[in-house]
């Protein structure tokens, strides 16, 4: 997926910012969250999050659900590198495995469980 954040901010600027964040907040993870291209779901009020490393993916789902005002029966799926991450994993584990060279973790969200639909 193409992340708008990457297109709006040059790599060096992102990397510099990501590096500063990691040094200043070593127990937190910088995350960029954007809606998948064809998702029929609400927009987030912001894209950039700084979350505790020990927060689980499941807890992060809850946080994002609240921010886009989803009802309990509405589906929400995350994609990290086109794969749905396990809800039991911590954001720190996800970050260690999937962060990019700019020190950010990128997560796409959708109402569909198949990426790109």
Swiss-Prot record:
Species the sequence originates in: Homo sapiens (Human)
Predominant cellular place of this UniProt entry's protein: membrane
Renumbered residue ranges of the record's region Interaction with LIR (LC3 nteracting Region) motif of ATG3: 48-50
Highest taxon above the source species: Eukaryota
Tissue: Heart, brain, placenta, liver, skeletal muscle, kidney and pancreas.
UniProt site (Cleavage): 116-117
Keyword presence, Protease: no
Effect of residue 116 to A: Impairs localization at the autophagosomal membrane
Residues anchoring lipid (Phosphatidylserine amidated glycine): 116
Keywords per UniProt: Apoptosis, Autophagy, Cytoplasm, Cytoplasmic vesicle, Cytoskeleton, Golgi apparatus, Lipoprotein, Membrane, Microtubule, Protein transport, Transport
Pfam families attached to this UniProt entry: ATG8
Subcellular localization(s) per the UniProt record: Cytoplasmic vesicle, Autophagosome membrane; Endomembrane system; Cytoplasm, Cytoskeleton; Golgi apparatus membrane
Protein name per the record: Gamma-aminobutyric acid receptor-associated protein
Organism taxonomic ancestry: Eukaryota, Metazoa, Chordata, Craniata, Vertebrata
